Amino acid sequence: MPEYDYIRDGNAIYERSFAIIRAEADLSRFSEEEADLAVRMVHACGSVEATRQFVFSPDFVSSARAALKAGAPILCDAEMVAHGVTRARLPAGNEVICTLRDPRTPALAAEIGNTRSAAALKLWSERLAGSVVAIGNAPTALFFLLEMLRDGAPKPAAILGMPVGFVGAAESKDALAENSYGVPFAIVRGRLGGSAMTAAALNSLARPGL
């Protein structure tokens, strides 16, 4: 029978993974805090080249971490993002909210003529001020968030704009970078992104260090 040579210790795998990322990824343009965040995101997507597409506004990390420490809710566009958040890492027992499956969402989608992912954000209105918004799946959700902010909606403390896909993903993130309405943000330019990267970023923000 064949014998396979591989590392069996979970902690050793974890530590070696991060060491490889730090050795191979170009982190030179990031601050120390941003580099820690970037390493987590690379770990989630498996591509060291992805750092070229990471953009963090100057005050993003500090704003997001301060909000989380103050107990801000985390508003997620997708259940996969919400489920990826490690609750034990949250500094203030922060509520993690996803309204995509709320029974009111389908009717709201029909009313506004948009996707359920976008319509679900209308149910965030009372929780939006000072929150940490995490969009890792639907470009329509990010576009709609920008429309809400344009129209005077309360501002979150930080936005993680990381939807993935071939239709609207790159454009929605470019729109956020062009005008975030004064809200600190993080994006992954282009088609790359997704729930795993977004949740990894949240977990890094929730508890600094690797």
Swiss-Prot record:
Active-site feature positions: 43 (proton donor/acceptor)
Keyword flag Isomerase: yes
Domain of life of the native organism: Bacteria
A family per Pfam: CbiC
Catalytic function, reaction form: precorrin-8X + 3 H(+) = hydrogenobyrinate
Enzyme Commission numbers on file: 5.4.99.61
Alphabetized InterPro entries for the sequence: Cbl_synth_CobH/CbiC (IPR003722), CobH/CbiC_sf (IPR036588)
Annotated metabolic or biological route of this protein: Cofactor biosynthesis; adenosylcobalamin biosynthesis; cob(II)yrinate a,c-diamide from precorrin-2 (aerobic route): step 8/10
Keywords: Cobalamin biosynthesis, Isomerase
GO biological process: cobalamin biosynthetic process
Keyword field contains Isomerase: yes
Quaternary structure (record): Homodimer.
Designated name of the protein: Precorrin-8X methylmutase
Originating gene: cobH
